[in-house]
């Protein structure tokens, strides 16, 4: 029904770097995902096509008095709403796309395409909980729909801070496995099965077999090739993995595939190796927010904060509802010691954050870090304000409680 496109982003200082790396690789921070060039991440680039639609040839004519639309009129309006949503999504006008798909759902709530399209819009914006719900609605309307199964599997492997990731990863594997049973010649289904296994920490012959089956079905499937290379490297089979990476880079003809390769490199902490790959991706698509996000992440790890700021700001202009982008932009401002900018950016991030993400914002790389910066700058009153904001988000943070008390005692009354 929907179809798919295979496009899938001193000792004290040492401790700080390790903490930052763990935060960068954690669920809520590092896993922005590439979906049609709009998101990216270690789960792999994967873009479900827009739901199929056929725009009506004649616009609905006004009637002299209100009448109940007949089935043909409802169908025409539904198809037009889907088309409007598809066009808006392709133009990255997400609010308009969401409105259009919701309108389609109201017209035909049992047609899976409306919920499926809505899920795509949420996934494009990394709104994983809402995307999951929308895709589940699509599956409820069409339980054996392979496209919906794979879309849901994709969303479920996106780690979420504080979420029940283990169960989600297991569900993702189950949905992908069901898809392979329904369509045993679907290369994407086997690739998603392998991705779900890797998300669960399964780097063994079963994961390898899933990716090899995908490549057997489609030898030109570069995305599966990159996924296989990652598994082989994890199994210390570098002699097999590295040629696959090199081949994938040579074959990559589009930005999303290059983003996937770069993200796989960053997953292995090959930060500097990822930079030329991302530069090439941005030559192909200067507004690819996935490439911009990964570039900013690499620069943050390397303490190139001014360059990271530029990358994250550009990514945020394209995807303004990304918590991860705003969170790491705030981290760049901390590195630049621009604490007022960090405070404002973390406030924007708080508006986009899940409950678990809000707790994260209360820590050392959030409002707590802003408070530390203000203390360092001798601005104790502002430090108290930042610490209090951190405690609003994470009331049980004992370290911030202690720092707030000390700052309050030093603050002028």
Language model: regions and residue ranges:
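Structural signature of tandem alpha-helical TPR/SEL1-like repeats
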Residues: 92-99, 124-137, 160-178, 200-213, ...
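Structural marker of alpha-solenoid helical repeat scaffolds
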Residues: 107, 141, 182, 217, ...
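TPR-adjacent "capping" and linker segments in tetratricopeptide-repeat scaffold/adaptor proteins
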Residues: 63-80, 355-364
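Short coil/turn linking the two alpha-helices of tandem helical-hairpin repeats
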Residues: 153, 158-164, 199-202, 357, ...
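Canonical tetratricopeptide repeat
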Residues: 117, 151, 192, 227, ...
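Alpha-helical segment of the N-proximal tetratricopeptide repeat
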Residues: 74-107, 120-124, 161-165, 195, ...
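Helix-start (N-cap) detector for alpha-helical repeat units in TPR-like alpha-solenoids
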Residues: 78, 112-113, 146-147, 187-188, ...
């Amino acid at each position: 029904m929907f179809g798919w496109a295979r496009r899938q982003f001193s000792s004290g200082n040492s401790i700080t770097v390790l903490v930052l790396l763990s935060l960068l690789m954690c669920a809520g921070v590092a896993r922005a995902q590439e979906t049609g060039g709009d998101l990216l991440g270690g789960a792999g680039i994967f873009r479900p096509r827009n739901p199929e639609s056929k725009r009506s040839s004649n616009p609905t004519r006004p009637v002299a008095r209100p009448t109940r639309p007949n089935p043909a009129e409802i169908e025409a309006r539904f198809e037009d709403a889907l088309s409007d949503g598809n066009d808006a999504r392709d133009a990255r006008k997400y609010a308009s796309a969401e409105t259009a798909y919701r309108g389609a759902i109201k017209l035909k709530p049992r047609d899976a395409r409306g919920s499926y399209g809505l899920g795509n819009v949420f996934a494009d914006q990394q709104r994983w909980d809402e995307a999951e719900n929308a895709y589940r609605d699509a599956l409820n309307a069409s339980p054996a729909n392979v496209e919906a199964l794979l879309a849901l599997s994709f969303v479920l492997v996106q780690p979420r801070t504080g979420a029940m990731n283990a169960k989600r990863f297991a569900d993702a594997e189950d949905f992908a496995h069901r898809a392979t049973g329904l369509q045993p010649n679907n290369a994407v289904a086997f690739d998603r099965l392998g991705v779900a296994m890797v998300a669960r920490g399964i780097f063994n012959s079963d994961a390898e077999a899933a990716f090899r089956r995908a490549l057997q079905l489609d030898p030109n499937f570069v995305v599966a090739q990159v996924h296989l290379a990652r598994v082989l490297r994890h199994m210390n089979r570098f002699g097999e993995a590295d040629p696959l990476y090199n081949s994938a880079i040579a074959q990559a003809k589009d930005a999303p595939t290059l983003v996937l390769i770069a993200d796989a490199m960053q997953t292995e902490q090959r930060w500097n190796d990822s930079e030329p790959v991302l530069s090439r991706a941005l030559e192909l698509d200067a507004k690819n927010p996935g490439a911009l996000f990964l570039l900013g992440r690499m620069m943050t790890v390397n303490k190139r904060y001014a360059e990271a700021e530029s990358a994250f700001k550009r990514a945020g202009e394209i995807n303004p509802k990304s918590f991860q982008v705003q969170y790491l932009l705030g981290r760049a401002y901390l590195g630049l010691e621009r604490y007022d900018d960090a405070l404002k950016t973390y406030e924007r991030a708080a508006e986009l954050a899940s409950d678990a993400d809000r707790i994260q914002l209360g820590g050392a790389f959030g409002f707590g870090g802003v408070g530390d910066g203000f203390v360092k700058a001798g601005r104790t009153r502002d430090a108290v304000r930042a610490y209090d904001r951190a405690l609003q988000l994470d009331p049980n943070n004992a370290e911030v409680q202690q720092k707030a008390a000390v700052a309050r005692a030093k603050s002028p009354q």
